Swiss-Prot record:
Protein's UniProt keywords contain Magnesium: no
UniProt name for this protein: Imidazoleglycerol-phosphate dehydratase
HAMAP family noted in UniProt: HisB
Gene source species: Akkermansia muciniphila (strain ATCC BAA-835 / DSM 22959 / JCM 33894 / BCRC 81048 / CCUG 64013 / CIP 107961 / Muc)
Molecular function via GO: imidazoleglycerol-phosphate dehydratase activity
One biological process term in Gene Ontology: L-histidine biosynthetic process
Length: 196
């Protein structure tokens, strides 16, 4: 089983997390921010990882620190659960529709962190109490700590809730593909360099 647990305590947040990459998509998430909890539940459900998360943050200021730090811890936990990455597919790609919204997510579990987060020129609407900039901060924290290459592009959309949901579900499906074990590649790294 590929599982891990991580903890992060700062002056702004206190986060404990356990995850199983080879789960069934069960989530028990409590961040104090209902919309963010909903997004994390979707991420667990669609990636099929089991996720237990308790987070306390300075939500009286805003959700930024909580969202960013949860992304940091989730990235660390997934990286730890992946271990040496032998046998993984490594790459994942998802086009995720959510009603009028379409988002493309491409991931490479390369050990080379990079994030591209793009939205259409002119901007997009925010979800209630969850600005689109928080989606970007989450992606950046996740990718930098998972040490993956992550490209997220919201191709179009009109509803802020649908846009955020398509981003989180898109990440889930790309991660599910990239982290999957390919039995034909058992015991080998998906790299001609011999390392990731």
């Amino acid at each position: 089983m590929r599982n891990a647990s991580c903890k992060r305590v700062t002056g702004e947040t206190d986060i404990s997390m356990e995850l199983n990459l080879d789960g069934t998509g069960c989530a028990a998430v409590a961040t104090g921010h209902a919309f963010f909890d909903h997004m994390l539940d979707l991420l667990a459900r669609h990636s099929l990882m089991d996720l237990t998360l308790q987070a306390r943050g300075d939500l009286e200021v805003d959700a930024h620190h909580t969202v960013e730090d949860v992304g940091i811890v989730l990235g660390e936990c997934i990286k730890n659960a992946l271990g040496d990455k032998k046998g993984i597919v490594r790459y994942g790609c998802s086009y995720l529709p959510m009603d009028e919204t379409l988002t493309r997510v491409v991931m490479d579990l390369s050990n080379r962190p990079y994030v591209a987060f793009r939205i259409p020129e002119g901007g997009l609407p925010d979800a209630p109490n969850f600005p689109l900039t928080l989606c970007e901060e989450f992606c950046r924290a996740l990718a930098n700590n998972l040490r993956c290459n992550l490209h997220v592009e919201v191709l179009y959309g009109r509803d802020g809730h649908h846009i955020a949901e398509s981003v989180f579900k898109g990440i889930a499906h790309a991660l599910r593909q990239a982290a999957a074990i390919d039995p034909r590649a058992a015991g080998t790294l998906p790299s001609t360099k011999g390392m990731l």
